[in-house]
Amino acid sequence: IENDLLEAQVLRTNPYSKMLIRLQGKDDPDPIRRVFLTGANPFVLKTEKLLEIASLIHKYFPSVNSIGCFARITDSANKTDDELICLHRVGYNGLTIGVETADDKALAFMRKGYNSKDILTQCKRLEQADIEYGFFYLTGISGKGKGEAGAKASARVFNQPHPFLIGPNMLTIYPESDLYQEIQNGN
């Protein structure tokens, strides 16, 4: 991680002009304010590791005041309320949570490991820690002929917490997956 941060620090825009600004002791006219951690869902990492990553980010980019990342609803369930508050204090905010849907039947079928009540519980905990979040919603995940019912179930749940965004996405189905076979069987 530290090597990636060093590389980003040097290559952010025009490395030559950035180097001159730094050597002349001038303030960067366009400092980095937000870092977004990529990968499947970095928020699943233990709090200690997330704090270590935040420390490195602030070391190499002291102007950063927001650290975002992808997350699952179950990630915050594995953290205490105090840990969530601590993570917010070091900059974690603006999480992108792949809730997928709030259709409990679809969540169970997809073996997501949570239900619509868990979405509400964990979002409330994030809000109490002042951590803002947005949702990724997978259209069509409720199955053949169930799209409207799934969308309505999701709307009922998604209208209760306060996501800054609900972004619809498509689901990628790989031929070697169980879901692909379900689709082939007309489900």
Please give the residue ranges for each predicted region.
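Conserved SAM/AdoMet-binding glycine-rich loop
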Residues: 4-128, 132
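Conserved C-terminal portion of the radical SAM core fold
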Residues: 94, 117-179
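C-terminal accessory regions of radical SAM enzymes
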Residues: 180-187
